[in-house]
Amino acid sequence: PTKMTRRTEPASSCSTGSLDCCNSSGDATDTSITTLLAGIGLPIGSVTGLVGVTCSPITGIGLGGSGCSSEALCCSNNSFKGLVALGCVPVDLSL
């Protein structure tokens, strides 16, 4: 199978969601992600795209720090108390 390269957007382009710093991320079809989603009551197949895992809001952009030492993502739905964030796109905090 061909591995898809993740597209990285400038952090400033995150206008549809929140900037989040996530410990890891994976495709919604990955076994570890589907297990996690099922564990919080989301039906398998109801979530698509990139999912952030163990996320917190990024603050301090433009204040001289990167604001995230893990994976910086722009996510459209982070209403699961930081456990997962849905609809994510990787972002570059330096752009």
From Swiss-Prot:
InterPro entries the UniProt entry points to: Hydrophobin (IPR001338)
Keyword annotations of the record: Cell wall, Disulfide bond, Glycoprotein, Secreted
Signal peptide boundaries: none
Pfam families in the record: Hydrophobin
Location relative to the cell: Secreted; Secreted, Cell wall
Covalent S-S links between cysteines: 14-74, 21-68, 22-55, 75-88
Residues linked to a glycan: 23, 77
Primary location: secreted
GO molecular function: structural constituent of cell wall
Regions that span the bilayer: none
SMART domains: HYDRO
GO cellular component terms, A-Z: extracellular region; fungal-type cell wall
Role according to the record: Aerial growth, conidiation, and dispersal of filamentous fungi in the environment rely upon a capability of their secreting small amphipathic proteins called hydrophobins (HPBs) with low sequence identity. Class I can self-assemble into an outermost layer of rodlet bundles on aerial cell surfaces, conferring cellular hydrophobicity that supports fungal growth, development and dispersal; whereas Class II form highly ordered films at water-air interfaces through intermolecular interactions but contribute nothing to the rodlet structure.
Family per similarity comment: Belongs to the fungal hydrophobin family.
Subunit-structure text: Self-assembles to form functional amyloid fibrils called rodlets. Self-assembly into fibrillar rodlets occurs spontaneously at hydrophobic:hydrophilic interfaces and the rodlets further associate laterally to form amphipathic monolayers.
Entry protein name: Class I hydrophobin 13
Organism in which the protein naturally occurs: Pleurotus ostreatus (strain PC15)
